[in-house]
């Protein structure tokens, strides 16, 4: 593949390492679900899914119907959980056709699925979601027994799992997380009291998985951790994870500008002395947030260089003072390792007051993904 002005490198060995770290950590009795929604957090869903399954993942999770179809069209046969809400007959028919396993969040949705599947003459495994405190998708946890009982009575549905999602698993204060676990336990107890079957249970995302075995149940759903990032600093010692994604771009022009020269839109940066600068072929249309303008450092020859002026749609400028004889075509590292130095998505997220998930998902498809 031609290395264009900018690209994303995906370290397959690092991904395999991370999957195996989680596989060993949760043990053989707990299923490992690789969360590959949002194009595997910007890493490329098909390749990541294939690699994760080969390395020891048991299940895949996606958020939309289209994401699931993409995996099936690539020949992936592993079980796929669709996390998002589905409520149209056309989508239900497609789910059945592509052998995806949907999340059901309400009795009304369960009835709709059963009605459509009855017309199709198909039976489908389904996963019931309880709201234990996220206040997003799901049936309120006190109604768990009624919900499970209804699904058990619907002939076209096969109960595959019961799960919930944690709102604060990455917070050092675990009070809310523990409250959600207690509610999940009470919901399970209500099934036993009603003499209903207990299906596969899962509660943990990456952060909760790293909290230990008490959170693992029958399966864990690991997203961010697979890609080598920790959900929170206090969880950084739990496993040895390696970042999978690197973002690089080429220098497309080098210039020397005199004192008093404004750089880029709005002249947010004005040179105080004669200085060398470079234009780098990557911008906010590629996923470099414009709000990082004049706050970003990138790596050139393993040395940090400062980004200057407003980041534009397709390009940005960097200060080359301190770099000896720079050349057009040299490669700049925006995220990743160069020599002894490393820049992570966490660095960008901290500067912007956001989360690393958003940074990773922001890298657009016009940046080719190169497997290394």
UniProtKB/Swiss-Prot annotation:
Keywords: Isomerase, Pyridoxal phosphate. SUPFAM superfamilies: Alanine racemase C-terminal domain-like, PLP-binding barrel. Its EC number is 5.1.1.1. The modification N6-(pyridoxal phosphate)lysine is found at residue 37. The active site is at residues 37, 265. Catalyzes the interconversion of L-alanine and D-alanine. May also act on other amino acids. This is Alanine racemase.
